[in-house]
Amino acid sequence: MQQIQKVKAREIFNSRGWPTIEVEVTTSCGRVGCAIAPSGASKGVLEACELLDGDKARLSGRGVLRAVENVHTIIAPALMGKSVAAQAEIDSLLIQLDGTTNKSVLGANAIVAVSLAVAKANASVRGVPLCIVFHNLLTSEGDDFVYVPPVPMLNVINGGVHADNRLAIQEFMICPVGRRSFRESMEKAADVFHRLKGLLKQYGKSTNVGDEGGFAPDLSSTEETLGLLSEAIGDSKESVKIALDAASSTFYKDGKYSIDGKLLNVNEMVDFYAAIIEKYDIVSIEDPLYESDWESWQVMTRKLSDKIHIVGDDIFVTNPKIIKKGIKTGVANAVLVKINQVGTVTETIESIKLARKAGYKVVISHRSGETEDLSIAHLAVACGGAFLKAGSLSRSERVAKYNEVLRLEEVFV
């Protein structure tokens, strides 16, 4: 009953209006798992390769029909008769079929959609939520699931490559902490979100939104933005903190960081972060430095890791081998997890296990090109107490993730 009987792929569209791939896995008992590959705007140089058609005459070369064909002609025949419960075996086969370190032959977009669809089909066969399948992969067999609410990180002001404004830092987030439930966290976040919108209108700023649903006003500097965000948080500062995704590789060139009209060297950049941490209630900074500058990451980790979460995204790309190196060399103290960065459920689970064992905080994350797929909500719930970074409280493909956690909370509490 658990055997794979059919694998079907199709080209659909993501929240940025570009094609992506959706995969359906059907079992011999008629159960179906359906998953969609997300897509990033700012990508780590070592992350798994999204396979695009490259035909400029069609969809600016960003079609994914080659990835769809790879599912139908290469992956599907190899998976026929396999059990959807054999996640590790199937993911290993997908990696073997591709044969490259970055999944560039079949495409990480094809592979991740298949891998997630298998996990969802398994959940359907078992009659359990997807988060239970993820929990079983994360823990020893027989361990009971204990619900611990994720902590939302909501990207309320967009900058960098996610918005058409002057802000170098890509994401300014609010993070409700210390709440007893995810619902309480979201209610607190919603209050701040609407106060921020009111302040933007009051100051004559645009309330248009960026790729991830956050406001994208034309603010002039990091300090102006943090000041505005602090004003919106107001009396809630004990329970609502600020988190940043600098995505610093996007404003780094020739050894300098171009931010707020200045060119800073790495020491000045670290001092910049230290200063704003002292001034504002910042609890987390993601990708604060250039992704290939491991030595400077070590310096910043030693200097600031007792004050904030230093989150590795582009530097780690959810790759267990790279995360292992980071842990060994003292780089960062938190790991951002994006399933499509590494390409399979099994490798993602391994990365989370490594991070947790080393005492690193785990942040489950969306991408800028998202869809209605809810897998990351289930992964965040499975991790127990992890951060969930899924965008803002506008754009349905973002809010859907938070709403799914609210539904799951009702099931487990």
From Swiss-Prot:
State the source organism's domain of life: Bacteria
Gene responsible for this protein: eno
Catalytic activity entry: (2R)-2-phosphoglycerate = phosphoenolpyruvate + H2O
The record's GO CC annotations read: cell surface; extracellular region; phosphopyruvate hydratase complex
**Biological process according to GO:** glycolytic process
Which cofactors are required for activity?
A: Mg(2+)
Q: Which organism is it from?
A: Neorickettsia sennetsu (strain ATCC VR-367 / Miyayama)
Query: What's the stated role of this polypeptide?
Result: Catalyzes the reversible conversion of 2-phosphoglycerate (2-PG) into phosphoenolpyruvate (PEP). It is essential for the degradation of carbohydrates via glycolysis.
Q: Give the family per the record.
A: Belongs to the enolase family.
- What's the protein name? Enolase
Which pathway is recorded for this entry? Carbohydrate degradation; glycolysis; pyruvate from D-glyceraldehyde 3-phosphate: step 4/5
Q: Where does this protein hold (2R)-2-phosphoglycerate? A: 170, 338, 367-368, 389
Recorded GO molecular functions are:
magnesium ion binding; phosphopyruvate hydratase activity
Q: HAMAP family, per this entry?
A: Enolase
EC number, as in UniProt: 4.2.1.11
